[in-house]
């Protein structure tokens, strides 16, 4: 299970990158949207299974991911259209939105759920973001 928790965030990021690279052509906006919504659905299901979320919590997690991941995607697209090549800027955008998601999760989850989420990978992700800030 720990292996899954380690691999899942990396796989989720690659979920958006690898299919486009494998096709050697840009994905259509519809394909990108479908892929993002599939990822959001899987992540909501994963968190529901791990944390035993109530229905209203599932709704807020889904809404948070939908809003924040779309906002992150839009910000990354604006960097790409400006032809920014500095990967640190892209990671900064990603870290900013992942931090925002964690802040929102902390408000949605009860204390026991937050501790379980934090131990299942949230804390490690935060440490990695903190290292990149230095």
Q: Language-model features: where?
A:
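Bacterial Sec-dependent N-terminal signal peptides
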Residues: 1-28
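Charge-rich (acidic/polar
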Residues: 23-134
